[in-house]
């Protein structure tokens, strides 16, 4: 699951990366504390990029949904955990790895959020296997 960092926030002593994907796209961490490795792809690769500083930070990762449980870094029981990641900035891409198999089939349109595209990576090659849902797809089949 490839997400974009939309905000970097501090709450008390904890730092949060807020991304544009929520538990509606990957429910496993919220449902039972499933662990997914994460990696960062910096948008800015220049010499002043935070990711190139070598600095690493303990961060919690959350989504945009209006639910306190919209946290990708939680343990079984719903406790917020952190991950050691390179320093991130708004616009960087955060990859939540090993999200395949159950990612799409457990996804929902909660909060009227369209589902993301699905990409299969095999042998170092990526290909689109399901297109991103459009607003038209989201409301298809509804009548007023």
Q: For the regions a protein language model found, what residue spans apply to each?
A:
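Charged (often Lys/Glu-rich) extended helix/loop segments that serve as interaction or gating elements
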Residues: 1-144
């Amino acid at each position: 699951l490839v997400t974009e960092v939309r905000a970097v926030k501090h709450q008390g002593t904890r730092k949060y990366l807020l991304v544009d994907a929520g538990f509606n796209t990957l429910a496993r961490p919220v449902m039972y504390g499933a662990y997914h490795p994460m990696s960062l792809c910096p948008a800015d690769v220049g010499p002043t990029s935070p990711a190139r500083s070598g600095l690493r930070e303990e961060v919690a990762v959350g989504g945009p949904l209006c639910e306190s449980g919209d946290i990708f870094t939680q343990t079984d029981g719903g406790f917020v955990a952190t991950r050691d990641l390179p320093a991130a900035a708004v616009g960087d891409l955060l990859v939540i790895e090993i999200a395949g198999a159950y990612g799409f089939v457990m996804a929902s349109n909660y909060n009227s959020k369209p589902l993301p595209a699905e990409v299969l990576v095999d042998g170092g090659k990526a290909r689109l296997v399901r297109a991103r849902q459009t607003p038209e797809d989201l409301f298809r089949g509804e009548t007023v």
